[in-house]
């Protein structure tokens, strides 16, 4: 009897142990299933159920881009002056020591693409069905600073989008090879089929975008809008926010287009010639073709697919393109003028009521030095907290709160060699908002 009782206890002990193990395995399996079930259906920004919240927590833990030092990014994005001052002081100290990632670094790390994408924390799946169903095209024109390019690509990257990269023919071979190495890791990122040497303020800057336009239209990706970027741009909206903004355009384009000043009219009064730089000649130009009134803007656009098709295929557009090739900085009046051309899809009329400033358009947020000042006295924005280059602000941490209050999709200029804190905080802000749908 004693032996039988002992056996019963042992048997009961084994049963409880097995049951405990089974329950433990079930919990582990449940947790694992929650981790593995982070697909498009469970990533609904409007959902507050446990599964979606836990899924986002797991995602953010693995994909967050926190500032690498003790910087209060949440305070900086809110405009907290103590946090801003601390970041500016920190930047003065750190930028003396910080070495940017080199071409060699990217050539080495991209030998293993999966490691590169994981280590650099690229988002490799759509975060919502709305984004999946609304792919965006990018024309990215670059010529230097490989880290700037890689961080910009990471910030705007989504697997459903399509990216054409144009590298200046004059760029160093090491830079070109590093760009090729990075884009080789992504099936939806490619080098433009035709590369040109880009000369400042010349036609070649437009030609780079046109080359990407041709390639992007041949892509099988059914993109809806095209955004163009340069190496000093950075997004200030998440991909989901961009999709929402582009849908609200309802087929319209968004770009600066205003009446030119007398000073800017001189840009197309005489012909310019290009060697290694642009030269003004004494040869006067004929009036624009088709009696088209000229407008001025900047190099950046948010253009519908139909607009892009008409840029490349419409005979009137082609005549204007030929006419502006020997003008000064044609990128700053070609797009602005086409935006007012009645034959262009998504354009607006000539009438002054339709003039669009850079602050009204959503294409690019820029602080011009000659417009900075006291906002209470009527200035459009406060002074730059970074430095100026060609009268344009290279943003500092003190500009970030203002930047995020605007409706633009991207801003210009950023440079980690000038202020990396503002970029790190913007990266942290955008990644948090992309995954959680809320600000820091």
From Swiss-Prot:
Disulfide bonds join 73-230, 164-384, 185-212, 393-425. N-glycosylated. It is found in: Golgi apparatus membrane. Residues 31-440 are lumenal. The chain crosses the membrane at residues 13-30. Glycans are attached at residue 108. It is an enzyme of class 2 (transferase). The keyword Transit peptide does not apply. Keywords: Disulfide bond, Glycoprotein, Glycosyltransferase, Golgi apparatus, Membrane, Signal-anchor, Transferase, Transmembrane, Transmembrane helix. It catalyses: a 3-O-[beta-D-galactosyl-(1->3)-N-acetyl-alpha-D-galactosaminyl]-L-seryl-[protein] + UDP-N-acetyl-alpha-D-glucosamine = 3-O-{beta-D-galactosyl-(1->3)-[N-acetyl-beta-D-glucosaminyl-(1->6)]-N-acetyl-alpha-D-galactosaminyl}-L-seryl-[protein] + UDP + H(+); a 3-O-[beta-D-galactosyl-(1->3)-N-acetyl-alpha-D-galactosaminyl]-L-threonyl-[protein] + UDP-N-acetyl-alpha-D-glucosamine = a 3-O-{beta-D-galactosyl-(1->3)-[N-acetyl-beta-D-glucosaminyl-(1->6)]-N-acetyl-alpha-D-galactosaminyl}-L-threonyl-[protein] + UDP + H(+); a beta-D-Gal-(1->4)-beta-D-GlcNAc-(1->3)-beta-D-Gal-(1->4)-beta-D-GlcNAc derivative + UDP-N-acetyl-alpha-D-glucosamine = a beta-D-Gal-(1->4)-beta-D-GlcNAc-(1->3)-[beta-D-GlcNAc-(1->6)]-beta-D-Gal-(1->4)-N-acetyl-beta-D-glucosaminyl derivative + UDP + H(+); 3-O-[N-acetyl-beta-D-glucosaminyl-(1->3)-N-acetyl-alpha-D-galactosaminyl]-L-seryl-[protein] + UDP-N-acetyl-alpha-D-glucosamine = 3-O-[N-acetyl-beta-D-glucosaminyl-(1->3)-[N-acetyl-beta-D-glucosaminyl-(1->6)]-N-acetyl-alpha-D-galactosaminyl]-L-seryl-[protein] + UDP + H(+). One of its GO terms (cellular component) is Golgi membrane. Residues 1-12 are cytoplasmic. InterPro entries: Glyco_trans_14 (IPR003406). It is a single-pass type II membrane protein. Its EC number is 2.4.1.102, 2.4.1.148, 2.4.1.150. GO terms for molecular function: acetylgalactosaminyl-O-glycosyl-glycoprotein beta-1,6-N-acetylglucosaminyltransferase activity; beta-1,3-galactosyl-O-glycosyl-glycoprotein beta-1,6-N-acetylglucosaminyltransferase activity; N-acetyllactosaminide beta-1,6-N-acetylglucosaminyltransferase activity. It comes from the Eukaryota. The keyword Transport does not apply. GO terms for biological process: protein glycosylation. Pathway: Protein modification; protein glycosylation. Its main location: Golgi. PANTHER family: BETA-1,3-GALACTOSYL-O-GLYCOSYL-GLYCOPROTEIN BETA-1,6-N-ACETYLGLUCOSAMINYLTRANSFERASE 3, GLYCOSYLTRANSFERASE 14 FAMILY MEMBER. Glycosyltransferase that can synthesize all known mucin beta 6 N-acetylglucosaminides. Mediates core 2 and core 4 O-glycan branching, 2 important steps in mucin-type biosynthesis. Also has I-branching enzyme activity by converting linear into branched poly-N-acetyllactosaminoglycans, leading to introduce the blood group I antigen during embryonic development. Belongs to the glycosyltransferase 14 family. This is Beta-1,3-galactosyl-O-glycosyl-glycoprotein beta-1,6-N-acetylglucosaminyltransferase 3. It comes from Bubalus bubalis.
